[in-house]
Structure formats: C-alpha cells, structure tokens
C-alpha cells in the first residue's frame, strides 16, 4: 500500500491528527527560511508523542552535516530529507538514512539521481526562489520515468486531496508527500484535508 508523509508539522495537534488519519511519516522542517520551520526542541517533544511505527523525518536545506547529525540524534529522526543542493559526498557524511529531494524541470533532472546512495528519492516541483512547499506540481510523466529507472520515488509538489489519487495511479510511487496541499495557513494543517488526502491516497490502487 502507498505510504503517506505529511510534512511541515509544527504542533502536537496536527501531528496526532495525521497519525490518527493513517499517516506513515511526519516531516519536520529545520530550514529557518521556511514558514513551516520548527526548532529541534519543539520537534523532539512532538516526536516523543508518536507511536513506534510512525516515522519522523527531518527536512534540512544546505545545513552543515554536523548540525544535521546532531539534530537527527537529539530528535531521534528515522530519516533525513535533504532538500537543497547537497552533493553525493555531502550525503555520505550523514549518519542517518537519507532521502534526497530533486526539484524537477525536465527529464535531464533525473540524471544526477544515480550518483546518490539514498533510501529514497523525493521529486518536487522546481522553483527558482523556494526549496519546496510551493504548492506547484510538475509533469508526472517525469516521475513515472524515474520509476522505470528503478528509483524509489516519493512524489511531492502540488498534491492535494483532489489530485493525489490520480497522481498515484499515473506514477505508482513508493510514497506521496504533502505540505501546503493540506493546510489552512502555512504551518497549520486542516484536519479535514489531512484525513481526505490520506484516505484518497490509500484507496487509489
């Protein structure tokens, strides 16, 4: 069954709503420029409330590797999501399992993926100004091509309760990732949208 990650969690209430709705993973944004930024101490308190089989994912953008490793240990993250311009050499310095994000404009954006050793590959829409969380989608044919190349794809970018089922049917990804598509405001989740998104994703195939 498709896995679902709800990203940009900033409160215990939103975390528990997502868990109760069936989320497989929750994302915590440690990038200070993001409207969904959370301090590690706050994230750790929320993560301590999670049941054992819900994975905590920490999102970082061009952060020093030693900081990533320290936050990962302190928060007991299950996965580190690198959403910036991190190189394969950088990724090898991360102690925890890595999911690298690639911002997609064309098929050529898939070429560097083979150079990385990672647990998963997140495909997001390209923006010249933002590292994810834009609410924009991209051509899902590119994501489907990535699947045919044998990559474990986590599909992100412009997903909503209304389009997630079709996205899953077209791409057949390992997982889907949503942030702005289930929000009432940046960093504030809409409980009804969260429930609808997860339900539609889980029932898509």
Swiss-Prot record:
The keyword Protein biosynthesis does not apply. It catalyses: N-(5-phospho-beta-D-ribosyl)anthranilate = 1-(2-carboxyphenylamino)-1-deoxy-D-ribulose 5-phosphate. One of its GO terms (biological process) is L-tryptophan biosynthetic process. The keyword Nucleotidyltransferase does not apply. Its EC number is 5.3.1.24. Pathway: Amino-acid biosynthesis; L-tryptophan biosynthesis; L-tryptophan from chorismate: step 3/5. It is an enzyme of class 5 (isomerase). It holds the Pfam family PRAI. SUPFAM superfamilies: Ribulose-phoshate binding barrel. Keywords: Amino-acid biosynthesis, Aromatic amino acid biosynthesis, Isomerase, Tryptophan biosynthesis. One of its GO terms (molecular function) is phosphoribosylanthranilate isomerase activity. Belongs to the TrpF family. This is N-(5'-phosphoribosyl)anthranilate isomerase. It comes from Trichlorobacter lovleyi (strain ATCC BAA-1151 / DSM 17278 / SZ) (Geobacter lovleyi).
